[in-house]
From Swiss-Prot:
Impact noted for substituting residue 273 to E: Strongly reduces DNA-binding and displays 12000-fold increase in spontaneous mutation accumulation
Annotated protein name in UniProt: DNA mismatch repair protein MLH1
Source species taxonomy: Eukaryota, Fungi, Dikarya, Ascomycota, Saccharomycotina
Ranges where the record places region DNA- and ATP-binding: 1-335
Outcome of swapping residue 216 to I: Fully functional in a mismatch repair assay
Length: 769
C-alpha cells in the first residue's frame, strides 16, 4: 500500500525552517544584531545568560518599530527591506528575507519592547510561533528596540542537547560581536554575562578600526598591522577592498579566523582564506598564523546573497579573478616591507650591559640593507639583554611559592622510624605491625608481559603485633610473630629498612585478560587530573574519618578523597606488578597464632553454620595455587584429609614498601574473596581479586574522638592522637609520594577531587594572602 502525499502542518513547516536558520544562540544574535545595524543604531548592548540559551537580550537605539507593524513582526516573509525579487540585485541591507524573528519565535519565547521617535511611549508585546500573544502594552522606554529571547530551543530537545557548554556558546557570541564591532564604523557594542558587573567586550562608537582590533583581540595584534587597500577595478565589478593585515613582525601560534565582510556581510570564503594564507606562508616563520581583516565591496548586481540559510556564504561574479587580485596585492604589500624585520634575540653575559655588544660601531658601519638588518638584530639583542638584567615585576597573585619536586625536611626523619627490629620490648601502636622476619617465594612460572621494567628483587616481609583493634577481632590483635632469634631458619640478612631482599627475576606476563585490563586503565586516564597528581604538594589531612586530604597544584588548592585515590592507586600497582609481588609473611612458629580462615569468617553473623563458611573456604582453597602464583596469597592446610576448617592464611602480597595494610580488615577480605569475586570468568576473576586487594590496602578511617570528654581514659585519648599522627605520617611520607610517581588518574574520580580555592581569586577578595 503506497503512502499518500499530505501537506505538512504549518507549525511543522515553521519549525523545520527555524532549524535551518537558527542553529545555535550565536545565529539568533547575529540576525538580531544585523537588524539593529539596519535600523541605524549607534549603540548595541547585548546581555547573555547561560550561553544565550536561558536569556539572550539585545538593545539598540535605532529607529524602532511602528506600533502598527507589531502584529506581523514575527510572521514569516515580512520585511521592510524588500518588495520584489529584483530588489535583491541592489540590496544594501543585512536583512531581506523576513525570516529571522519568525524563526526565533518558533523555537523560543520572544518579547519585543520598541519605540519610534514620534511615539510618546514604548510598546511591549510577546510572541510565540510567529503570532502576537496579546495587544501591545504601553511602557516607559527609550528610542530604539529591545528584543528578549528566552528559553531557546525549549521545544526542540535534540537541538538543545547538541549545543556545547554555556562557556563555549558564550565564546562564539563574543567572537561574532567582536567581528561586527571591528567592521561597523561609528557603532558601539557591549556584551556581558547576566549578573557580571564588568563587560566582556565594550567598544565605543568613536573608536577607530585600530582601536577596535586592540579591544577585541589584544595589543600585540593591533601594534603589528598595516593598512590594506585596493581601488576600484571596473572590469571585475570590484568597488574597493579595505582592511588591516598583519606585518611580518607579527607572532602568533594561535589561529585567528580571517574576518571577511563582502558588501558588509560577515562571510566565510575558503578560497580567499587559502589564497591569503599561502601568501603569508612565504613570509612568516613556520608555525605562525596571520591576522587578516578585509572589507570587500562588489557591485550588488554581481553578488548573489541568497545562497545560504544563515547568510554565511555569498557568490559573486569573477570570483577567481578578484581573489587573485587581492592575493597579488597582499604579496606586493608584504614584499615592500620585507627589507627589514625585527627579531627577538637575547644573549647571556656576566659583563656589564655596556660591554655586551659594540652597538655604536655597528650603527656606524650600517651602509647597506644587509648591515641595516644586522643592526636591528643587534639593537634588539642589546635591549632584550638589558631588560633581562632589570628585576622583573613579581606578580604576587600568580606566584607559586613551593616547588612540587622539593622534599620536606621531615621526610628525612621518617625512614628510621618505619620499623623496629630490637625485639618485642617496644611495640608499635595502632594497626601497623612490627616487621621482624622476611621470606620469599621462588616458584614463579615465566610469562610474557609487554612491560619495559628491568628484573628486580622480590620483597617479602613478616609482621607481628597488631594493636588497638576492636574486641571482636581480638585474635588478630593478639597475633604475634617471633623475633629473629626465635627462628633458626632465618639466615638471610635484614637491610636497614627492614626488608630481606632476595634476587628474583621479574616474571613476564602474557595473559590476554591482564593486557585488556591494562588497556582499560590507559583508556580511562584523565590527562589534566593526572598532571595535578604528578605535580602535587601535600598540604595535610583534613578529616581522618571521611578520609579527606588537601593538596596544592600550581595556584590551586584541592580537597580529595584519599580513600578513593588510594583504591585506584593500589589497583594500578596490582596490574603493573601482577605475578611479581613481594610477600608479607603472616604465619608464626606458634601454631595458636596462625590465621585460620574459618575463624575469620566466624565474625559474620550471616555465616551461622559450618556449611556456609566451608563453601567460601572451598572456593578460595580450590584456587590456592593461582592465588599464590599470581598474587602471593599463600594458603596452607595442616589438617587431616584437607579439612577446610584448618586452612590458614600464610602470606599477603606486598604492594608498597613501607606500608602494611590493616589486618583488622582480613575477615572482610576473605569474605569478599569468596562472595564478590566471579571465579568462572578469567578476566572478571583476575580483576575482582585485584580490586579486593586494593580495598584491603585502603588506609583505615579514624573515627573522631572528643579529647575534651572527661569520660574517656587517658589511654583512649592517647590512642586516638597516635592513630591520627600515624595516618598523617603514612600519607605524607609513603602514600602521596607514591601517588606522585605512579598514579594515573581515571576520569571517574573527578567527583572525588574538588577545587576549594585558587590564589588569584583569593587576592581579588583579600588583596593579599
Amino acid at each position: 500500500m503506497s503512502l499518500r502525499i499530505k501537506a505538512l502542518d504549518a507549525s511543522v513547516v515553521n519549525k523545520i525552517a527555524a532549524g535551518e536558520i537558527i542553529i545555535s544562540p550565536v545565529n539568533a544574535l547575529k540576525e538580531m544584531m544585523e537588524n539593529s545595524i539596519d535600523a541605524n543604531a549607534t549603540m548595541i548592548d547585548i546581555l547573555v545568560k547561560e550561553g544565550g540559551i536561558k536569556v539572550l537580550q539585545i538593545t539598540d537605539n535605532g529607529s524602532g518599530i511602528n506600533k502598527a507593524d507589531l502584529p506581523i513582526l514575527c510572521e514569516r516573509f515580512t520585511t521592510s527591506k524588500l518588495q520584489k525579487f529584483e530588489d535583491l540585485s541592489q540590496i544594501q541591507t543585512y536583512g531581506f528575507r523576513g525570516e529571522a524573528l519568525a524563526s526565533i519565535s518558533h523555537v523560543a519565547r520572544v518579547t519585543v519592547t520598541t519605540k519610534v521617535k514620534e511615539d510618546r511611549c514604548a510598546w511591549r508585546v510577546s510572541y510565540a510561533e510567529g503570532k502576537m500573544l496579546e495587544s501591545p502594552k504601553p511602557v516607559a522606554g527609550k528610542d530604539g528596540t529591545t528584543i528578549l529571547v528566552e528559553d531557546l530551543f525549549f521545544n526542540i530537545p535534540s537541538r538543545l542537547r547538541a549545543l556545547r557548554s554555556h562557556n563555549d556558546e558564550y565564546s562564539k557570541i563574543l567572537d561574532v560581536v567582536g567581528r561586527y564591532a571591528i567592521h561597523s564604523k561609528d557603532i558601539g557594542f557591549s556584551c556581558k554575562k547576566f549578573g557580571d558587573s564588568n563587560y566582556s567586550l565594550s567598544v565605543k562608537p568613536s573608536y577607530t578600526v585600530q582601536d577596535r582590533i586592540r579591544t577585541v583581540f589584544n595589543k600585540s595584534v593591533a601594534s603589528n598591522l598595516i593598512t590594506f587597500h585596493i581601488s576600484k577595478v571596473e572590469d571585475l565589478n570590484l568597488e574597493s577592498v579595505d582592511g588591516k593585515v598583519c606585518n611580518l613582525n607579527f607572532i602568533s601560534k594561535k589561529s585567528i579566523s580571517p574576518i571577511f565582510f563582502i558588501n558588509n556581510r560577515l562571510v566565510t570564503c575558503d578560497l580567499l582564506r587559502r589564497a591569503l594564507n599561502s601568501v603569508y606562508s612565504n613570509y612568516l616563520p613556520k608555525g605562525n598564523r596571520p591576522f587578516i581583516y578585509l572589507g570587500i565591496v562588489i557591485d550588488p548586481a554581481a553578488v548573489d546573497v541568497n545562497v545560504h540559510p544563515t547568510k554565511r556564504e555569498v557568490r559573486f561574479l569573477s570570483q577567481d579573478e578578484i581573489i587573485e587580485k587581492i592575493a597579488n596585492q597582499l604579496h606586493a604589500e608584504l614584499s615592500a616591507i620585507d627589507t627589514s624585520r625585527t627579531f627577538k634575540a637575547s644573549s647571556i653575559s656576566t659583563n656589564k650591559p655596556e660591554s655586551l655588544i659594540p652597538f655604536n660601531d655597528t650603527i656606524e658601519s650600517d651602509r647597506n640593507r644587509k648591515s641595516l638588518r644586522q643592526a636591528q638584530v643587534v639593537e634588539n639583542s642589546y635591549t632584550t639583554a638589558n631588560s633581562q638584567l632589570r628585576k622583573a615585576k613579581r606578580q604576587e597573585n600568580k606566584l607559586v611559592r613551593i616547588d612540587a619536586s622539593q622534599a620536606k625536611i621531615t621526610s628525612f626523619l621518617s625512614s628510621s622510624q618505619q620499623f623496629n627490629f630490637e625485639g618485642s620490648s617496644t611495640k608499635r601502636q595502632l594497626s601497623e605491625p612490627k616487621v621482624t622476619n622476611v621470606s620469599h617465594s621462588q616458584e614463579a612460572e615465566k610469562l610474557t608481559l609487554n612491560e619495559s621494567e628491568q628484573p628486580r628483587d622480590a620483597n617479602t616481609i613478616n609482621d607481628n603485633d597488631l594493636k588497638d583493634q576492636p574486641k571482636k577481632k581480638q585474635k588478630l590483635g593478639d597475633y604475634k610473630v617471633p623475633s629473629i632469634a626465635d627462628d633458626e631458619k632465618n639466615a638471610l640478612p635484614i637491610s636497614k629498612d627492614g626488608y630481606i631482599r632476595v634476587p628474583k627475576e621479574r616474571v613476564n606476563v602474557n595473559l590476554t585478560s591482564i593486557k585488556k585490563l591494562r588497556e582499560k586503565v590507559d583508556d580511562s586516564i584523565h590527562r589534566e587530573l593526572t598532571d595535578i597528581f604528578a605535580n602535587l604538594n601535600y598540604v595535610g589531612v583534613v578529616d581522618e574519618e571521611r578520609r579527606l586530604a588537601a593538596i596544592q597544584h600550581d595556584l590551586k588548592l584541592f580537597l580529595i578523597d584519599y580513600g578513593s585515590v588510594c583504591y585506584e592507586l593500589f589497583y594500578q600497582i596490582g596490574l603493573t606488578d601482577f605475578a611479581n609481588f613481594g610477600k608479607i609473611n603472616l604465619q608464626s612458629t606458634n601454631v595458636s597464632d596462625d590465621i585460620v580462615l574459618y575463624n575469620l569468617l566466624s565474625e559474620f553473623d550471616e555465616l551461622n553454620d559450618d556449611a556456609s563458611k566451608e563453601k567460601i573456604i572451598s572456593k578460595i582453597w580450590d584456587m590456592s595455587s593461582m592465588l599464590n602464583e599470581y598474587y602471593s596469597i599463600e594458603l596452607v592446610n595442616d589438617g587431616l584429609d584437607n579439612d577446610l576448617k584448618s586452612v590458614k592464611l600464610k602470606s599477603l602480597p606486598l604492594l608498597l614498601k613501607g606500608y602494611i595494610p590493616s589486618l583488622v580488615k582480613l575477615p572482610f577480605f576473605i569474605y569478599r574473596l569468596g562472595k564478590e569475586v566471579d571465579w568462572e570468568d578469567e578476566q572478571e576473576c583476575l580483576d575482582g581479586i585485584l580490586r579486593e586487594i586494593a580495598l584491603l590496602y585502603i588506609p583505615d578511617m579514624v573515627p573522631k574522638v572528643d579529647t575534651s570528654d572527661a569520660s574517656l581514659s587517658e589511654d583512649e585519648k592517647a590512642q586516638f592522637i597516635n592513630r591520627k599522627e600515624h595516618i598523617s605520617s603514612l600519607l605524607e611520607h609513603v602514600l602521596f609520594p607514591c601517588i606522585k610517581r605512579r598514579f594515573l588518574a581515571p576520569r571517574h574520580i573527578l567527583k572525588d577531587v574538588v577545587e576549594i580555592a585558587n590564589l588569584p581569586d583569593l587576592y581579588k577578595v583579600f588583596e593579599r594572602c
